[in-house]
Curated annotation (Swiss-Prot):
This is ToMV resistance protein Tm-1(GCR237). PANTHER family: UPF0261 DOMAIN PROTEIN (AFU_ORTHOLOGUE AFUA_1G10120). One of its GO terms (molecular function) is catalytic activity. Homodimer. Gene3D superfamilies: Aldolase class I, Uncharacterised protein family UPF0261, NC domain, Uncharacterised protein family UPF0261, NN domain. ATP binds at D18, T19, K20, T55, R92, G124, S125, G126, G127. Inhibitor of viral RNA replication which confers resistance to some tobamoviruses including tomato mosaic virus (ToMV) (e.g. isolate L), tobacco mosaic virus (TMV), tobacco mild green mosaic virus (TMGMV) and pepper mild mottle virus (PMMoV), but not to resistance-breaking isolates of ToMV (e.g. LT1, SL-1 and ToMV1-2) and tomato brown rugose fruit virus (ToBRFV). Prevents tobamoviruses RNA replication by affecting the association of tobamoviruses replication proteins (large and small subunits) with host membrane-associated proteins (e.g. InterPro entries: Aldolase_TIM (IPR013785), Pyrv/PenolPyrv_kinase-like_dom (IPR015813), TIM-br_IGPS-like (IPR009215), Tobamovirus_resist_UPF0261 (IPR051353), UPF0261_C (IPR056778), UPF0261_N (IPR044122). Transgenic tobacco plants expressing Tm-1 exhibit resistance to tobacco mild green mosaic virus (TMGMV) and pepper mild mottle virus (PMMoV), tobamoviruses that cannot multiply in tomato. Signal peptide: none annotated. It comes from the Eukaryota. The gene is Tm-1. Keywords: ATP-binding, Host-virus interaction, Nucleotide-binding, Plant defense.
Length: 754
């Protein structure tokens, strides 16, 4: 490949040569011309390599006189390899995803060789999706540019928290014309300037002896505090990076922490937690604070702007909040005062995180107000709510040598409080103000394939690693293709705004009419048999029958009557008398296209669950089963009961995570003890967030507990993000049968004999 030809700096011009060859060549020529022009005044000579990322059958082997990397060479960086890619060439969405992952690894290798000076590409919506994911994986500072037809729309999904630059193409990228010439030329020149500028700067200012860098979070209502903190930190010899706490801001800060760019944090404005808990538009996700604690860097935390939840224009505030105390910040931003009850939840979220810390943490709490609006005479002044937040944190946080809690008699924007924050930071931070700042390096193919070990929480996993790259070493081509087609259909539905609906079936007639109703997935497991025999679903978890044998028996009843819909098997992964690898092959040969972990120990809690984990019969065996099924190319749709389990399943390769809220509560034999519907929203969102941190493309469904009707499913789906549908079992076959038979008999009994 061209990356190995020279150790001199090199840029990649990347695109799909099968559809954008002329535009890619034109862009490459102007990048080279601009680099040569700028290089006349520079000691750097930068080479240009054209990289083809086409996903079609059409081959391109050269591009004018440029060094050229054909698509097959890029694809060789993916574990699927070129031959398997051919199977998916006609399935556009999956082909793009595979090529994007291959490009990510290709660029990682080039960056490891220390000669990658920048990347530039062009594309429509598909091309932008393909390129952006790979470009984002490169470290901050490496110039990365895409000329895109979607640069002027909603771009967060493309840019994330990276320094990727999108240039609007203005016209479609479809030939060279008077407009595209100007846009491509300007983008090429701008990119070349970025490349040469960075190379010259790196020569003059080495990054290996930089100042200790501190991340600081800010909102408009905490600006006086942050400005004072920043000014003092600079005097003390620190460099500061300030992040607007808008959801994206917190994620950007933690990404830089993970990358090694930030060595300490003053998390003054934690308002994103309020939006996450209550449902505002500037929310963090359930991983907030994790990167800081994992990297074990000094953390001083306060409660800035936890008196407010953010919404858009006043007309967009959800109906249930319309009677709350609202402050219109401007025409586009409305703020809602938080309540005593909500502040208790914020404290619980923060305390749960910080109590896990193994490094120095200091929490500073201002008694007289947490924002400019939380002061006497201001809209959000509420001493009861603010003092509740302080009391709860004092009560919940473990105050010890590792974690200090300081309650200070100031308002957050008082100069004395700002000084107290910095004093606390100096107490727990290293004495040196300079660091050997070496941001996280890119990974080789082997590194990436060995990433993401299953959580140590599950001892029965025995520390096994499961690749997140689509690694199917034990897959039959027909099984893998079936999985691919199913997932593509589901992704197509999601893109059209339609929910994914899965259903459990305990009888042939249930499965037959679930398919007739338009269901997307059907799962057979032993509880279906008990359920349709009038017993509770929990019977499937008790030693009343051989769970795996029941599923095989049900296959003969169900598979012949289901014509098109994917049918999966519920697998008891903790079965001590079955070799899982052989049993999965048996299920595959019978005709199942995928698996789910049921019966599951996730429905057990307390000492019994703990004993199962301790004696090697825990959730880890279910994770291991899903990983084995994934390697075989089977569709995997496991249940997860908490964020940690979702992470483990996502790392094992799960395609669809089903957020399980417990036994279904409705009907004559439903459970009576469960979380509330409102609590389910929070739990489902946390599981979805955890899943998407590991595998952004995973499908997430909600299931169980109080979610037992279309109305309740709609309630959850409308209040969550990244949740794509509902999976029902009792709600799909038991409840409809109970209601229909009861009503029908009642109608017959109401016949008049007179």
């Amino acid at each position: 490949m061209a990356t190995a030809q020279s150790n001199s700096p090199r840029v990649f011009c990347i695109g799909t040569a099968d559809t954008k060859f002329d535009e890619l060549r034109f862009l490459s020529e102007h990048v080279r011309s601009s680099l040569n022009s700028f290089s006349n005044k520079s000691s750097f000579k930068v080479g240009v390599t054209v990289v083809d990322v086409s996903t079609s059958w059409k081959e391109t082997n050269s591009c004018a006189d440029f060094d050229f990397v054909p698509s097959k060479d890029v694809l060789s960086c993916h574990t699927l390899g070129e031959e398997t890619m051919g199977t998916f060439a006609d399935i556009r969405g999956l082909a793009i995803a595979i090529m994007s992952k291959a490009l990510e690894t290709f660029l990682s290798i080039a960056n490891d060789e220390q000669n990658l000076a920048g990347v530039i590409g062009l594309g429509g919506s598909g091309g932008t999706s393909l390129l952006s994911s790979a470009f984002r994986s490169l470290p901050i500072g490496i110039p990365k540019v895409i000329i895109s037809t979607v640069a002027s729309g909603q771009t967060e999904s493309y840019i994330g928290t990276s320094d990727l630059v999108l240039f609007p193409s203005v016209v479609d990228i479809c030939g060279i014309n008077n407009v595209s010439k100007v846009v491509l030329s300007n983008a090429g020149a701008a990119f070349a300037g970025m490349v040469i500028g960075r190379l010259e700067s790196s020569k003059e200012h080495s990054i290996t002896n930089g100042k200790f860098t501190v991340g600081v979070t800010m909102f408009g209502v905490t600006t006086p505090c942050v400005n004072a903190v920043k000014e003092r930190l600079v005097k003390e010899g620190y460099e500061t990076l300030v992040f607007h706490a808008t959801g994206v801001g917190g994620r950007a800060m933690e990404d830089l922490v993970r990358g090694g760019f930030i060595q300490g944090v003053l998390d003054i404005t934690t308002t994103e937690v309020a939006d996450y808990v209550v449902g505002g538009v500037m929310a963090c996700d359930s991983s907030r604070f994790d990167a800081i604690l994992e990297k074990k860097i000094p953390l001083v935390l306060s409660v800035g702007a936890l008196d407010m939840v953010n919404f858009g224009p006043k007309t967009t505030i959800p109906p249930e909040f319309q009677q709350r105390k609202i402050h219109e910040h401007n025409e586009q931003v409305s703020l809602m005062r938080t309540t005593v009850g909500e502040n208790k939840k914020f404290a619980a979220f923060i305390a749960e995180k910080l109590n896990k810390a193994s490094s120095s943490v200091c929490v500073c709490l201002p008694e007289k107000g947490v924002s400019a609006l939380d002061a006497p005479g201001k809209d959000f002044y509420d001493p009861e709510a603010t003092s509740c937040l302080t009391r709860e944190l004092q009560m919940l946080l473990e105050n010890n040598e590792r974690c200090q809690v300081k309650v200070l008699p100031y308002h957050i924007n008082d100069a004395e409080f700002a000084n107290a924050l910095v004093d606390s930071f100096l107490e727990i931070s290293p004495k040196s103000r300079h660091v050997e700042c070496q941001p996280a390096e890119s990974k080789s193919i082997q590194d990436i394939q060995n990433d993401n070990a299953v959580l140590e929480k599950y001892p029965s996993c025995n520390g096994k690693n499961f690749s997140r790259l689509n690694d199917f070493p034990n897959a039959k081509p027909e099984t893998l293709q079936k999985r691919t087609v199913i997932l593509q259909k589901l992704k197509d539905q999601i893109s059209k705004g339609k929910p994914i609906i899965g259903a459990g079936a305990g009888t042939g007639i249930s499965a037959k009419f679930e398919e007739a109703g338009g269901v997307d997935l059907i799962v057979l497991y032993n509880s279906g048999r008990f359920r349709m025999a009038g017993r509770g679903s929990l019977a499937g978890l008790l030693p009343f029958a051989d769970a795996n044998a029941i599923v095989l028996e049900m296959a003969n009843e169900v598979l012949p009557v289901v014509k098109e819909v994917a049918v999966l098997a519920g697998v008891c992964a903790t079965d001590p008398f079955r070799r899982m690898d052989n049993f999965l092959k048996q299920l595959e040969s019978v005709g199942f296209c995928g698996v789910q972990n049921f019966p599951t120990v996730g429905l057990f809690d307390g000492n019994f669950r703990q004993n199962l984990e301790e004696t090697g019969m825990g959730y880890g065996l279910e994770v291991e089963m899903i990983a084995a099924a994934h390697r075989m190319g089977l569709l995997t749709t496991p249940y997860a009961f908490c964020p940690d389990e979702a992470v483990a399943m996502a790392e094992a390769g799960a395609d669809i995570i089903v957020a399980h809220m417990g036994l279904t509560t409705s009907g004559s034999i439903g459970a009576k003890t469960a979380v509330s519907l409102e609590e389910s929203v929070t739990c489902v969102q946390a599981i979805a967030d955890a899943t998407h941190r590991i595998y952004p493309d995973a499908i997430v469904l909600c299931h169980g507990g109080p979610i037992s009707s279309p109305e309740e499913a709609a309630y959850v789906l409308k209040r969550t993000t990244g949740v794509h549908g509902f999976y029902g079992a009792s709600s799909m076959e038991r409840l409809p049968v109970e209601q229909a038979i009861t009503a029908t008999v009642q109608q017959y009994k109401s016949i008049s004999m007179e």
